[in-house]
Amino acid sequence: MGAQGFFLAVEGIDGSGKSGIVRSLAAHLGAEGRDVLVTREPGGTPEGEAIRGLVLAGADEAWDPMAELLLMTAARVQHVRRVIAPALAQGQVVISDRYAGSTLAYQGTGRGLSEAFIRTLHAEATGDLWPDLTLVLDLEAGIGLARSRRRLTGETLDEGRFESLDLAFHERIRAAFLAQAARDPGRHAVIDASGTPEEVQARACAALTPFLAQAPV
């Protein structure tokens, strides 16, 4: 359990609807009277948002995988120490749109870096802070990629570096998230992300409720 609060991460492939579910869950929990903080990775702090702009834009070959990992970790240090840990200490429910599960999936499985090294680096950088619960929004990779590319077409900010990669890459990422959930079922729930936003929200709320019932928030 994350200090006095509750730490929830929402993970999934690009186009799985994470941001919408984060907003819906925050509204739902807020209506229940809970003190909710919504954040995202990479980002969450001015320094993290600057790193986000560096890492998510440009050509895929712009960053060496190790450099990419270290940038993501640098952003997370700021995020945990300045935002997440203080909020948990104050008893808030923290909902993060991506966290370390994405690092294991994208920089580990996707880029071929050592999972053991990523976990060691994470432990040193964050005090080994992991979410109390990670919701994995699961969707066929082809559907998610098509959704994500449609969304990016209408945006001015270029955050489409990972969306430019082929379907096989995104299928590996999906498999990586599912493998994480299978290895640690006590801290993960896989949510079917197909269907309407309302249907997905209902599934997410149903998975979250028993965990929050045991939380001191």
From Swiss-Prot:
Single GO BP term: dTTP biosynthetic process
Reactions accelerated catalytically: dTMP + ATP = dTDP + ADP
Record keywords: ATP-binding, Kinase, Nucleotide biosynthesis, Nucleotide-binding, Transferase
This protein's record includes keyword Kinase: yes
Designated name of the protein: Thymidylate kinase
Chain segments annotated as coiled-coil in the UniProt record: none
Organism: Cereibacter sphaeroides (strain KD131 / KCTC 12085) (Rhodobacter sphaeroides)
Highest taxon, organism lineage: Bacteria
Signal peptide, first to last residue: none
Family statement drawn from the similarity comment of this UniProt entry: Belongs to the thymidylate kinase family.
Keyword Protein biosynthesis found: no
Functional note: Phosphorylation of dTMP to form dTDP in both de novo and salvage pathways of dTTP synthesis.
Binding residues annotated for ATP, in chain numbering: 12-19
PANTHER family in alphabetical order: THYMIDYLATE KINASE (PTHR10344), UMP-CMP KINASE 2, MITOCHONDRIAL (PTHR10344:SF4)
An example Gene Ontology CC term for this record: cytosol
Gene that this polypeptide is encoded by: tmk
EC class: transferase
Enzyme Commission code: 2.7.4.9
Molecular functions per Gene Ontology: ATP binding; dTMP kinase activity
